[in-house]
């Protein structure tokens, strides 16, 4: 399903979030199952399916990473996150350094500050990569699509790492 078409948006990495939210509200009203309470079972099922598509589409389009993945899927680019080995040696080394920093943070004199510092570094990298990703997605040639797919893989790792940092920060804050 093309969620851009569902929301009447031009496929683009940069979406008008206000327009997306407004269209979501309109589509929710049109497809909400309560509107079909007295309808036939078939119509109720169709409304439920349409409403699920609207919800799924909104979730995909509202976040940059899932929106990028959707754009690439629409272009026929397979995103085999787990199966595709990262070819960027420098990024692999950086991953190992970040993992080491994450592990070492709990033994630091001020673990929370160490985690916050790591989180700031990762957040800056995410911001930079999202900017690069937007540039590649504005193009549609094979090389740009492959570069965008590689950035999506990197961003997946970085978002997962940020989540792990948050978990460790929360655990420290509980004490």
From Swiss-Prot:
Q: Which terms does the UniProt entry file under GO BP? A: [2Fe-2S] cluster assembly; protein complex oligomerization; protein folding
Could you cite one Gene Ontology molecular function of this protein?
Answer: ATPase activator activity
Keywords, alphabetical: Chaperone
Give yes or no: UniProt keyword Transmembrane helix.
Answer: no
Q: Name one GO cellular component term.
A: iron-sulfur cluster transfer complex
- Annotated J domain residues: 2-76
Tell me which InterPro entries the record gives: DnaJ_domain (IPR001623), HscB (IPR004640), HscB_C_sf (IPR036386), HscB_oligo_C (IPR009073), J_dom_sf (IPR036869)
Please give the function described in this protein's UniProt entry.
Co-chaperone involved in the maturation of iron-sulfur cluster-containing proteins. Seems to help targeting proteins to be folded toward HscA.
Kindly give the NCBIfam families that the UniProt entry links to this protein: hscB, PRK05014.1
Complex and partners? Interacts with HscA and stimulates its ATPase activity.
PANTHER family (UniProt xref) = IRON-SULFUR CLUSTER CO-CHAPERONE PROTEIN HSCB
What is the official name of this protein in its record?
Co-chaperone protein HscB homolog
Upper taxonomic lineage: Bacteria, Pseudomonadati, Pseudomonadota, Gammaproteobacteria, Alteromonadales
Q: Which gene encodes it?
A: hscB
């Amino acid at each position: 399903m093309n969620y851009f078409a569902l929301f009447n948006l031009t496929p683009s990495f940069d979406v008008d979030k206000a327009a997306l939210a407004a269209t979501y509200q309109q589509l929710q009203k049109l497809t909400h199952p309560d509107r079909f309470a007295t309808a036939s079972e078939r119509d109720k099922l169709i409304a439920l399916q349409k409403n699920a598509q609207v919800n799924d589409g909104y979730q995909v389009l509202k976040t940059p990473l899932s929106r990028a993945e959707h754009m690439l899927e629409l272009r026929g680019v397979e995103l085999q996150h787990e199966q595709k080995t990262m070819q960027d040696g420098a990024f692999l080394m950086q991953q190992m350094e970040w993992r080491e920093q994450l592990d070492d943070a709990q033994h630091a004199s001020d673990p929370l500050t160490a985690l916050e510092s790591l989180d700031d570094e990762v957040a800056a990298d995410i911001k930079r990569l999202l900017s690069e990703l937007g540039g590649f997605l504005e193009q549609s040639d094979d090389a740009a699509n492959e570069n965008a797919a590689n950035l999506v893989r990197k961003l997946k790792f970085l978002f997962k790492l940020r989540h792990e940092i948050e978990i460790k920060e929360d655990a420290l804050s509980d004490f």
